[in-house]
Swiss-Prot record:
One of its GO terms (molecular function) is nucleic acid binding. It is found in: Cytoplasm. Signal peptide: none annotated. This is DNA polymerase III subunit alpha. DNA polymerase III contains a core (composed of alpha, epsilon and theta chains) that associates with a tau subunit. This core dimerizes to form the PolIII' complex. PolIII' associates with the gamma complex (composed of gamma, delta, delta', psi and chi chains) and with the beta chain to form the complete DNA polymerase III complex. DNA polymerase III is a complex, multichain enzyme responsible for most of the replicative synthesis in bacteria. This DNA polymerase also exhibits 3' to 5' exonuclease activity. The alpha chain is the DNA polymerase. The gene is dnaE. It comes from Streptococcus pyogenes serotype M3 (strain ATCC BAA-595 / MGAS315).
Length: 1036
């Protein structure tokens, strides 16, 4: 029977449409018993292909296509693994090929268990190679020209499932080669998957011996994987068990904990670790963290269930004492449930490459590697790549891909988006392109590297998996799942920017305050830090900076560290339903049901609410006498909702509880309660470890806020300016001679850096810093290299006031910029003693300056206009920070945004405003009656007094507005010659509606008219529009 050997899969990137799952399905439909894959150079899909075939009742045949230079000739070879030995040889051959190191001598040394096929298209009778081989023939091979001494074998290339796929493969080739469809060679025909019996009949008729050779070749093919654990030996000269015991005992003694119950807990854990064969694992993790600390890196408090291990704590793998905090080892490692321990190594994200180098050097470049991942065609990428080759312009592509949501597939967006569907259906070629895009969506496009994963092995990795070359170290060809399935150790090196933040804050405190802080040793009950959590002042704090967590903190108002840990756990679906109960019970406003005195100590810390998975385990241990290992199995069954297992466990739980003298009814009720909570109970060990890291960051924010904001603003892409301003920091005005490159905070002043100016070349910014001081605008421009003498680079510097120290009129500098550039480049060199003749100009208003600064660097740097208004105000108002719920108040604010809706009942319009007073933000509601009165006055960016009642909603204050009053009584004055352009002026003014009154003075007849029906929003654009029709404009 025919066997399909030469199948290219989607792992021959953009050269095939054969994905494995559909391959298995179609092969069975077409009557195949034996199928193969033969990707070019790589074995990316080999493991999943073999396991998939076995699962689907198909015989797998693993092949590899390589091209090798021999005697100045490129020879194309198809290599077939005939057995497990041949499989292992293919791993090595593919690794050599993917590392650029494959040559004929190496190949010949690794051909045991491998059959070689040379396709007839690449064969000639002059070819002489140092090994036996088959000649692969297809339906189009001229058999009369074949060497009669060579064995023939059927070999038909497959790249797609059906002839209809040829157009899609043609598109993939165009994308791969970055060509248009017209420039891309057409795809070879007759490479679709064909019925097995049809091909069997063909070869029986035309080349029966070739078919027999194929049957003989594949008849005994079978592959077996070694799935045994292959942990690297940490120290070949010493017992891992002995070394681990010595290190952990020394660690506890160093911490002053060599006493009971620590000694018995340590012995208990060491026995389990040794029995499960994981001594080397702990030593390797210890070694990696030791390396980080030896370099001065902050390695954090650990994460996950590993925080429940005393061994990990003694080795400083984690920073939480599991005995003191009642954390369970069995939640981490359970002898009754064999699985690899999983300790993720957190490290500062800026040092990850250092760890990769250490692993490579310490454990060997052939024993360690990074892990491959596959980038696929996402819906947006598929649309962009395909439609581009149909000649669709970029702006249309952008508009189309904007309609695709983050979680959308092409099928779902077509179904739910009317506008997307209309575009696709508007043209025949769009429908065709869309069909192709859907066909390639999800297919691998290229390889990438796992963000965290590293694989390590006791022996050479290529004995187990194929590799390829990488920049820092080798990269696996198998994905993470296939690696672990082969018994290899996968470790995750997780670069956490929060650890970078902590380390940089420690360094800055030491530099600025001369104070060395051991952040791992701070008091987790520090009052100032607890107060910060209680206020919800946690912007920038790991795990607690999202609005949901902030609002929860404001409700709970944690009074001790344990309640911060509880907040982490309550901030999850399901558990959050018990927040009110938690608060009321803590305040004594609701009865705490502890069920049975024997489990009261387990439930008391969380006021009778089962928040943690460990509580379920402890209850099973104390109430029903389960071992903690068995209790962990119960927890897993509950969390996975394994009904059959849970039913069995329930009967066991009740029987065991009754054996201890518990009442059956109580036991059954308790089990149901445990079952309910286990579905969303949180890992207490993980919650503790990450809450500790959050507390460390918050400690800096509470005690060293200037350090906190300085680091967060310079090492994070998030915007912390608003938060800093709400914490009484002020943005300082900087000059060309003082502005830093990165943001800087000194005392309570924020100095915005040049890096914030969008579009400013970094080299130009560095040049400014290196060349200063400058003593005038002319001096700066004279010394500026010609490549930077462009208005697009210079104007932002002027608009944000960097030259105010030389000339405070920014508009004047801008209006003279063209002349200045001519002067410094031409006239200045001719007449060195001459000076530039400045032309005067009316400067920007304070509001305009502030707006320009906001636009360019994201925040105003000069004095906020609202502060000027406040200083001159005769009206009483309350800062937003001092508002009290259920009180009447007047606030002086600027409107940031206006959102208008219609009420569901009456259909009337009402509005939601977001406003600020330069320090804090406030949400304001105008109901229909008030909105109808004031809607014409409300303009984003303008300043107002708002009067209303302060309410609390979702634990945030907001105002229900009753009155609106403009804060500025300025008018917009127009000086015009006569009435000639009245209609044009009226039309322009009408296009800029606002709240500023307009007064027109006619010069010819000395007439002054205040417009009663038109008020405007004064902008530079308005001035420009009016310029041809007026003599002068004044805003005053």
């Amino acid at each position: 029977m025919f066997a399909q050997l030469d199948t290219k899969t989607v792992y021959s990137f953009m050269d095939s449409l054969i994905d494995l799952n559909h391959y298995f399905e179609r092969a069975k439909q077409f009557g195949y018993h034996t199928i193969g894959i033969m990707d070019k150079d790589n074995l990316y899909g080999a493991y999943h292909f073999i396991k998939g075939c076995q699962k689907n009742g198909l015989q797998p045949v693993l092949g590899l296509e390589v091209e090798i230079l021999y005697q100045e000739r490129q020879v194309l070879l198809n290599l077939i693994a005939q057995n497990t030995q041949g499989y292992h040889q293919l791993l090595k051959i593919s690794t050599a090929k993917m590392s650029g190191k494959l040559h004929m001598d190496y190949l010949c040394q690794h051909l045991e268990g491998i059959a070689v096929i040379i396709p007839s298209k690449g064969w000639s009778d002059t070819l002489v190679v140092p090994f036996d081989y088959y000649i692969g023939v297809d339906q189009y091979t001229d058999l009369s020209h074949m060497d009669s001494k060579r064995q023939l074998i059927p070999l038909r290339t497959v790249r797609y499932f059906a002839q209809d796929d040829m157009e899609t493969l043609h598109m993939l080739h165009a994308i791969r080669d970055n060509l248009s469809l017209a420039e891309t060679p057409v795809v070879e025909s007759d490479q679709e998957l064909t019925d097995c019996q049809q091909l069997t009949t063909f070869y029986q008729t035309h080349c029966p011996q070739a078919l027999q050779n194929l049957e003989d070749l594949v008849s005994g093919i079978y592959y077996d994987f070694d799935t045994n654990l292959k942990l690297p030996h940490f120290n070949r000269d010493k017992s891992a068990k002995q070394e681990l015991q010595e290190l952990t005992e020394a660690g506890l003694k160093e911490k002053g904990l060599w006493k009971e119950p620590y000694q018995s807990r340590l012995l208990h854990e060491l026995v389990i670790i040794s029995d499960m064969g994981f001594d080397d694992y702990f030593l390797i993790v210890w070694d990696l963290l030791r390396f980080g600390r030896s370099k001065g890196y902050y390695m954090g408090m650990g994460r996950g269930s590993a925080a429940g291990s005393l061994v990990a704590y003694a080795l400083n793998i984690t920073g939480i004492d599991p005995v003191q905090h009642d954390l369970l080892f069995e939640r981490f490692l359970n002898k009754e449930r064999y699985s690899m321990p999983d300790i993720d190594i957190d490290l500062p994200d800026i040092y990850r490459s250092e760890f990769l180098r250490y692993v490579r050097n310490r454990y060997g470049s052939d024993h360690s590697a990074q892990i491959v991942t596959f980038s696929t065609f996402g819906p947006k990428q598929a649309i962009r790549d395909v439609f581009k080759r149909f000649g669709v312009p970029e702006y249309e592509l952008t508009n189309l891909t904007k309609k695709i949501g983050f979680k959308d597939s092409l099928a779902t967006v077509y179904e739910k988006s009317i506008s997307f569907r209309q575009v696709i259906n508007s043209r025949t070629e769009f429908q065709k392109a869309f069909a192709i895009a859907k066909r390639i969506e999800g297919n691998p496009r290229q390889t990438s590297i796992h963000a965290a994963g590293i694989v390590m092995s006791d022996d050479t990795l290529t004995n187990h998996i194929p590799l390829k070359s990488g920049d820092d170290m080798m990269i696996t060809q198998y994905d993470a799942h296939a690696i672990e399935a082969n018994g290899l150790l996968k470790m995750d090196f997780l670069g956490l920017r929060n650890l970078t933040f902590v380390q940089k804050m420690q360094e800055k405190v030491a530099k600025d305050y001369g104070c060395q802080i051991d952040i791992a040793a701070i008091d987790l009950e520090d009052p100032q830090t607890l107060a910060l959590f209680a206020k919800g002042d946690t912007k920038g704090i790991f795990q607690f900076e999202q609005n949901g967590a902030i609002n929860l903190l404001k409700r709970i108002k944690p009074q001790r560290f344990e309640e911060i840990v509880a907040t982490t756990s309550l901030n999850r679906p399901g558990a959050s339903d018990y927040t009110t109960n938690f608060i009321k019970r803590r305040e004594g406003q609701e009865k705490i049901d502890l069920i049975d005195p024997v489990i009261a100590p387990i439930l008391e810390p969380t006021y009778g609410i089962m928040l943690y998975q460990e509580q379920v385990m402890q209850i099973a241990q104390i109430y029903a006498g389960f071992t903690l290992g068995k209790a962990d199995l119960l927890r897993r069954a509950m969390s996975k909702k394994n009904l059959q297992e849970m039913q069995k466990m329930e009967e066991d739980f009740i029987a065991s509880a009754k054996h201890l003298g518990r009442a059956e009814e109580t036991a059954r009720g308790l089990f149901k309660r445990m079952e309910k909570f286990a579905g969303y109970g949180f890992n207490r060990s993980h919650a503790f470890a990450y809450s500790a890291l959050a507390f460390q960051l918050a400690y800096f924010k509470a005690h060293y806020p200037a350090v906190f904001y300085d680091i967060m603003m310079n090492y994070s892409s998030s915007d912390y300016i608003t938060d800093a301003l709400e914490s009484d920091f002020q943005v300082a005005q900087v000059t060309i001679n003082s502005i830093p490159y990165t943001d800087k905070i000194e005392a309570s002043k924020i100095y915005m850096g040049l890096k914030n100016i969008k579009g400013l070349p970094r080299d130009f910014a560095y040049w400014i810093i290196e060349q200063r001081p400058f003593n005038s605008v002319e001096d700066f421009l004279t010394r500026t290299p010609e490549k930077y003498q462009k208005k697009v680079f210079l104007e932002p510097l002027i608009k944000i006031g960097l030259f105010d120290c030389f000339e405070p009129n920014r508009k004047k500098i801008l209006d003279n910029l063209d002349g200045l550039l001519v002067f410094v480049n031409e006239l200045g060199s001719l007449f060195s003693d001459s000076s530039f003749s400045w032309v005067d100009a009316k400067d920007y208003s304070a509001t305009e300056k502030y707006s320009l600064e906001q636009e360019i660097v994201g925040v105003g740097m000069s004095k906020h206009p609202l502060i000027d208004i406040a200083e001159k105000s005769t009206q009483t108002f309350t800062p937003i920070s001092q508002l009290v719920k259920e009180s009447e108040a007047v606030v002086l604010i600027q409107i940031d945004s206006i959102r208008i809706i219609r009420t569901k009942t009456s259909g009337q319009q009402m509005a939601f405003l977001s406003v600020n007073d330069t320090k804090k933000k406030l949400d304001v509601t105008l109901f229909p009656q008030e909105y109808a009165i004031y809607k014409d006055q409300l303009i984003e960016g303008e300043f107002y007094y708002l009067k209303g009642r302060i309410k609390e909603r979702d634990h945030r204050l907001q105002m229900v507005c009753q009155q609106v009053q403009m804060a500025i009584s300025q008018k917009y004055w127009l000086l015009v010659e006569n009435h000639q352009f009245d209609s044009q002026i009226s039309e322009i003014l009408g296009a800029f509606p606002g709240t500023t009154p307009v007064v027109i003075h006619y010069q010819k007849n000395k007439e002054t008219i205040a417009l009663t029906k038109i008020q405007v929003h004064v902008t530079e654009n308005l001035k420009e529009k009016l310029r041809p029709f007026v003599l002068k404009t004044v805003f005053r």
